[in-house]
Amino acid sequence: MSRIGKKPVALPKGVTAEIKGQTIEVKGPKGTRSFTATDDVTLAIEEGAVKVTPRGLSKRARQQWGMTRSMVENLTVGVSEGFKKELEIQGVGYRAQMQGKTLKLALGYSHDVNFETPEGVTISAPKQTEIVVEGIDQQLVGQVAANIREWRRPEPYKGKGIRYKGEVVFRKEGKKK
């Protein structure tokens, strides 16, 4: 039995949900998001909360039960508060700046890396060594942050590179003479 799926998803103030068949559409102050659930679960709005129930006791139905409930919760958090990923840049000469909708990264290559901001996400660089990725879609925000980090992952010897804020990089000792 799914313990996650049992809890109903409360709708915060200013957020409305509408169910059409297996699709739930959530509207809030930051925008609108929708999600289509599989046929293994049913969606219902009861007393200002979205309730997800399985259609059977098969293994797949129980898996989809918890996953669907988590997805609905992510929709409500996204349209009410939004999601945010912060990145730090460490290294001599490594820096980031915004030029319109393009993030320009100087990461020690012979050329600057230009990263176009995708639709549905806002990228900002409050400092030269900080990048903030924000949006209402948790998966898209995380993927964009991972794509930026991929240009120069933190290396274990000096710790240079792009890392998530608060990420601990495993450090290695250099060669001994």
Curated annotation (Swiss-Prot):
Spell out the Pfam families in the cross-references: Ribosomal_L6
Q: What does this protein do?
A: This protein binds to the 23S rRNA, and is important in its secondary structure. It is located near the subunit interface in the base of the L7/L12 stalk, and near the tRNA binding site of the peptidyltransferase center.
Among Gene3D superfamilies, the record links this protein to: Ribosomal protein L6, alpha-beta domain
Q: Which terms in the Gene Ontology molecular function aspect does this entry carry?
A: rRNA binding; structural constituent of ribosome
Q: How does it assemble?
A: Part of the 50S ribosomal subunit.
Full protein name: Large ribosomal subunit protein uL6
Taxonomy, top ranks, is: Bacteria, Pseudomonadati, Pseudomonadota, Alphaproteobacteria, Rhodobacterales
Q: Which PANTHER family match?
A: 60S/50S RIBOSOMAL PROTEIN L6/L9, LARGE RIBOSOMAL SUBUNIT PROTEIN UL6M
InterPro entries assigned to the protein according to its UniProt record, in alphabetical order:
Ribosomal_uL6-like (IPR000702), Ribosomal_uL6-like_a/b-dom_sf (IPR036789), Ribosomal_uL6_a/b-dom (IPR020040), Ribosomal_uL6_bac-type (IPR019906), Ribosomal_uL6_CS (IPR002358)
Which Gene Ontology terms describe the biological processes this protein takes part in? Answer: cytoplasmic translation
Ordered alphabetically, the record's keywords are: Ribonucleoprotein, Ribosomal protein, RNA-binding, rRNA-binding
Task: Name the family.
Answer: Belongs to the universal ribosomal protein uL6 family.
- The protein's superkingdom reads Bacteria
Query: GO CC annotations?
Result: cytosolic large ribosomal subunit
